[in-house]
Regions:
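Acidic, glycine-rich catalytic/binding loops that coordinate metals and/or anionic ligands
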Residues: 1-9, 14, 34, 39-40, ...
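Short glycine/threonine/proline-enriched tight-turn/helix- or strand-capping micro-motif at secondary-structure
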Residues: 11-44, 53
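A residue-level detector for short acidic-glycine micro-motifs
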Residues: 17, 35, 50, 82-85, ...
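Zn2+-dependent peptidoglycan hydrolase active-site motif and core
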Residues: 28, 42-87, 112-118
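Active-site scaffold segments
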Residues: 30-32, 96, 101-102, 113-119
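Conserved beta-strand positions that form and line the central face of beta-propeller blades
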Residues: 32, 69, 79, 102, ...
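A structural signal for short beta-strand/turn segments enriched in small hydrophobics and glycine
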Residues: 46-48, 91-103
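Short, charged beta-turn/beta-strand-edge "cap" motif at the junction between a beta-strand
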Residues: 54-56, 100-108
Length: 180
C-alpha cells in the first residue's frame, strides 16, 4: 500500500522519529522524515507567518534551524524545520505540493531531515497535535511506500555542483592566486 501525500516526490519516505516521543522515549514534538531526494514539499496550503533564518545556535527557536510556520486558517498551523537554506518570507502564500526547501542540518539535529509539527487551537508548541493527520503518512518509525498527491508543481533544479576538474577558474580567483 502506498500512502498518498504531498511532502515528497520520492516513492519511499523514511520516518526517523514519531510524535510524541523519540524511539528512545524522550519527548518529541513532531515527526522527522528523510526523503530520497532531500526535497520537501508543502503538506497543506497556507500563508507563511514565520520564516526563521538560522543564526547558528542549537537552542531556543534557533534549535529548529531554518524553518517556516504556515497558517492554514482557523487557528491551525504547520511547521517545517531544519532546511539547508531559508527561501520564504512572512506573507508568502504556499500551495499544497509547493517546493518548500531542501532538507538540511540547520539547528539542533543528528542528521539531514525535515521536522514537521502541527498546531491546532493556537500558535505555538503547546498546541501540538499528531502531524501525521496532515502529512498523509503513518505516525511511526519506518520506511513507507508513498505516492505523490500534490498536483503538478514544478520541482526546482538541483543546485550547481563544483566545477569539473580541469575547468576554468573564475577570473577573480586567478588574480587572487597570482598575487601570492
Amino acid at each position: 500500500m502506498a500512502y498518498k501525500q504531498s511532502i515528497t516526490k520520492s516513492d519511499t519516505i523514511r520516518e526517523t522519529a514519531g510524535y510524541p516521543t523519540y524511539p528512545s522515549g524522550g519527548v518529541h514534538g513532531g515527526i522527522d522524515t528523510v526523503h530520497t531526494d532531500y526535497k520537501a514539499y508543502a503538506p497543506v496550503a497556507g500563508t507563511v507567518v514565520t520564516a526563521h533564518i538560522w543564526e547558528g545556535s542549537n537552542t531556543g527557536v534557533d534549535s529548529w534551524g531554518n524553518y517556516i510556520v504556515v497558517s492554514m486558517g482557523g487557528d491551525k498551523y504547520w511547521l517545517a524545520a531544519h532546511f539547508a537554506t531559508q527561501r520564504w518570507n512572512v506573507g508568502d502564500t504556499i500551495a499544497k505540493g509547493d517546493f518548500i526547501g531542501t532538507q538540511g542540518q540547520s539547528g539542533n539535529v543528528t542528521g539531514t531531515h525535515t521536522h514537521w509539527e502541527y498546531w491546532v487551537g493556537g500558535f505555538g508548541t503547546r498546541y501540538r497535535q499528531d502531524p501525521s493527520t496532515i502529512l498523509g503518512i503513518p505516525n511511526g518509525v519506518g520506511t513507507y511506500a508513498v505516492e505523490w498527491d500534490g498536483g503538478d508543481t514544478p520541482t526546482p533544479p538541483d543546485p550547481p555542483g563544483p566545477p569539473a576538474p580541469g575547468g576554468k577558474l573564475p577570473i577573480w580567483l586567478y588574480f587572487k592566486l597570482s598575487r601570492r
